[in-house]
Amino acid sequence: MNDRMVWIDCEMTGLSLADDALIEVAALVTDSELNVLGEGVDIVIRPPDAALETMPEVVRQMHTASGLLDELAGGTTLADAEEQVLAYVREHVKEPGKAPLCGNSVGTDRGFLARDMRELEGYLHYRIVDVSSVKELARRWYPRAYFNSPAKNGNHRALADIRDSITELRYYREAVFVPQPGPDSERAKEIAARLSAPAAP
């Protein structure tokens, strides 16, 4: 089994789809074992001046500290960024609509992709693999694993944040998930039957 997974992270001037702009997009493709395929892409996008003027101060400070703000003047267009990301994704994912979007809290990223990079967003499966969901469950069910998870080093730069997300999922797979190959078929059927049985009156 070698199902592809498309990891995308975006940096924006804020979280509002009505007012804010994409300023960086990065992508890595992995196989089902979380091995990275190729070099990936990381592209800085020059936003409209209006989006820069209305950027919240906390976001401005974050992008200043990461160095991203200084790179925006030399950034490319949305169309060019989408073309570069799609070229990389298509190199490793041959069929559209097959590979899920993966990352941390990727619902927000998907919203901006659907607004600004429709062809790229449409190339992905409608399902997502959100590492933050795994993390939230681990916090509730396996707190020791949650509190000892790897430190993040991405510093709010898109490609580094993706690498952090992949590392996180590798960690939770080893620390929390049932070891491969998992339960045999009989045990799996037994669990399913027990959990789906009607509750006693």
Swiss-Prot record:
<dbReference type="GO" id="GO:0003676">
    <property type="term" value="F:nucleic acid binding"/>
</dbReference>
<keyword id="KW-0540">Nuclease</keyword>
<feature type="active site">
    <location>
        <position position="126"/>
    </location>
</feature>
<keyword id="KW-0269">Exonuclease</keyword>
<dbReference type="InterPro" id="IPR036397">
    <property type="entry name" value="RNaseH_sf"/>
</dbReference>
<keyword id="KW-0378">Hydrolase</keyword>
<dbReference type="InterPro" id="IPR022894">
    <property type="entry name" value="Oligoribonuclease"/>
</dbReference>
<feature type="domain" description="Exonuclease">
    <location>
        <begin position="5"/>
        <end position="169"/>
    </location>
</feature>
<dbReference type="InterPro" id="IPR012337">
    <property type="entry name" value="RNaseH-like_sf"/>
</dbReference>
<keyword id="KW-0963">Cytoplasm</keyword>
<dbReference type="Pfam" id="PF00929">
    <property type="entry name" value="RNase_T"/>
</dbReference>
<comment type="function">
    <text>3'-to-5' exoribonuclease specific for small oligoribonucleotides.</text>
</comment>
<comment type="similarity">
    <text>Belongs to the oligoribonuclease family.</text>
</comment>
<dbReference type="GO" id="GO:0005737">
    <property type="term" value="C:cytoplasm"/>
</dbReference>
<protein>
    <recommendedName>
        <fullName>Oligoribonuclease</fullName>
        <ecNumber>3.1.15.-</ecNumber>
    </recommendedName>
</protein>
<dbReference type="GO" id="GO:0000175">
    <property type="term" value="F:3'-5'-RNA exonuclease activity"/>
</dbReference>
<dbReference type="InterPro" id="IPR013520">
    <property type="entry name" value="Exonuclease_RNaseT/DNA_pol3"/>
</dbReference>
